[in-house]
Amino acid sequence: MAPKTIIEKIWDAHTVIGEEGKPSLLYIDLHMVHEVTSPQAFEGLRLAGRPVRRPDLTFATMDHNVPTVDRFNIQDQIARKQIETLEANCKEFGIEIAGLDSPNNGIVHVIGPELGLTQPGKTIVCGDSHTSTHGAFGALAFGIGTSEVEHVLATQTLWQSKPKTMEVRVTGELAPSVSAKDIILAVIAKYGVDFGTGHVIEFTGEAIRSLSMEERMTICNMSIEAGAKAGLISPDSVTFEYLRGRPNAPKGEAFDVAIQQWEALATDAGAVYDRVLTMNASEIEPMVTWGTNPAQGTGVSQVVPSPDDAKDENERRAIKQSLAYMGLEPGTPITEIAIQHVFIGSCTNSRLSDLRTAAELIKGRKVADGVRALVVPGSQQVKRAAEKEGLDEIFKEAGFEWRDSGCSMCLGMNPDTVPEGERCASTSNRNFEGRQGKGARTHLVSPQMAAAAAIAGHFVDVRTFQSEPQTV
C-alpha cells in the first residue's frame, strides 16, 4: 500500500461513496452548531418533515451574538431571535446545547476541545469558517454553509471534492516573546491569502511540535486565512495529554486503545504532498498587520510599506487601497502607530494560556490614557479558571475590562465594536474592512503584542518591552 498523509487517511476512512475525479460522500463524526448559520437549516428539516439523523453527534452553543456584559439582557432584536430560535430548535430536535446559563457556554471552537468533543481522526464540521481550529488535534475540520448544515443534520454526511494536500514545514526554534500567532501571520505574510486554495494544510516541523495544544489551535484556526480548506497537525503525546480526562474523551483502557489508533494517523514516511512550503521559525519576529487582509503584515521592527514596493499593478492598487482605509502613510515605523482599542479574545487567542501570557506582561502596569482594553475569555470555563488564578484582578487593576465569554469584538455582530476611524490591536483572525465595526481599523497581533500596545498606547517590540521596568 502506498504511503499516505494524515489528510488522505482521514478522508479515505470516512468516504461512504467515492469515485476518482468526482465528489465523495463523507461521513461526519461531529457537527457543531451555533445561532447564526443554523436557523434556516432547521427550518428546512421542519418543512421536509425530517429528524436530525444523529443528534448524539451534534452539539450546539451560542457565541456570535452573545453580549459580554449583562449577557442575559440581549437588546438587539435579531440577535435575541437567533439565540431563542437555536434554543427552541435544539429542544425540538433533541440536540445538546451549551446555553447562556450553561457552565460550558463559550465560543464553539473553544468549548469543543475543552469538552473533549474534538478528537484525532474525526471529521468535524460547523457553519463557521474557523472550524479549522479543531485540526490542531489531527482532525479533518472545516466550515460549511447553511445548506450543508441542513444536509449534515439530515444525513450525517456531506458531499465534498477531495482536496489537494500541502505541507507547511516550520523549522527551527522561536525566539523568546515570539508566539504561534506570529508563526501563522508570518506564513500568510510570506505566501499570501490564497496559497492554500484547494488544499488541506498539514503543519509540521520542530517549531510546530514544540507548541502546546492551545498554540496549535491558533495555527490551525488561521489556516483558512491562507485560503485553505482546512489545516491540521498530526496528533502526538501533547495531544493525548490534553485530551486525557476531558468529559467526552475515552476513559480508562478505552483511552489507551484510542491512543494506539490516533498514533496510526500520522503521515507515513515517504508520503507525497501536492505542495510543500517552508518557514524558519528563528527568523520570525513579533508580527503586526498594517492592511486589510491577513497577508498585509510585517515584523514589528519594520515600516509600513509603499505601493512602490509592490511586485505588480494589482498589488500596488491593493496596498494603496488598504493604506487609505487604514489611515497610514508609507514608511511609518510600526512602533509609531497609535491605537485606541485593544481586544484580547476570539477563537484564535482567548484560551487560558493566552490570558496568562498577557497578564504576565501587564502585571504592575497600567493601560495608557485614551486606550480602551477588553479581555474576553473564550468560554465560561476559561473565565472561571482565569479568575481562580487571579488573572482577572491583574487585568482589572491595569485598567482592562474583564468580560463574560463570547465572540465579542472579533466581528461587528454584538455590542462590542470599534468606532469608525479608530484603531484596534486585536488578537482575532480577520482584519477586513468593517470587520470590527463600520470604518474600524484592525491590526492583528498576538496576545503579548496586544497587551504591550495597551500599556504603551502604540505598538512596541514585545521582545524589549518585557525587560522594561514595571510600575508599582
Curated annotation (Swiss-Prot):
Pfam families in UniProt: Aconitase
GO biological process: L-leucine biosynthetic process
Keyword flag Lyase: yes
Listed GO MF terms: 3-isopropylmalate dehydratase activity; 4 iron, 4 sulfur cluster binding; metal ion binding
Region Disordered, residue ranges: 289-312
Domain of life per record: Bacteria
Annotated [4Fe-4S] cluster binding sites: 347, 407, 410
Cofactor binding comment, as recorded: Binds 1 [4Fe-4S] cluster per subunit.
Matches recorded under CDD domains: IPMI
Enzyme class: lyase
Biological pathway: Amino-acid biosynthesis; L-leucine biosynthesis; L-leucine from 3-methyl-2-oxobutanoate: step 2/4
Cofactor: [4Fe-4S] cluster
Biased amino acid composition, Polar residues: 290-304
Keywords associated with the record: 4Fe-4S, Amino-acid biosynthesis, Branched-chain amino acid biosynthesis, Iron, Iron-sulfur, Leucine biosynthesis, Lyase, Metal-binding
Subunit details: Heterodimer of LeuC and LeuD.
Family: Belongs to the aconitase/IPM isomerase family. LeuC type 1 subfamily.
PANTHER family found in the cross-reference section: 3-ISOPROPYLMALATE DEHYDRATASE (PTHR43822:SF9), HOMOACONITASE, MITOCHONDRIAL-RELATED (PTHR43822)
Described function: Catalyzes the isomerization between 2-isopropylmalate and 3-isopropylmalate, via the formation of 2-isopropylmaleate.
Name the UniProt record assigns to this protein: 3-isopropylmalate dehydratase large subunit
Species the sequence originates in: Halalkalibacterium halodurans (strain ATCC BAA-125 / DSM 18197 / FERM 7344 / JCM 9153 / C-125) (Bacillus halodurans)
Lineage, opening ranks: Bacteria, Bacillati, Bacillota, Bacilli, Bacillales
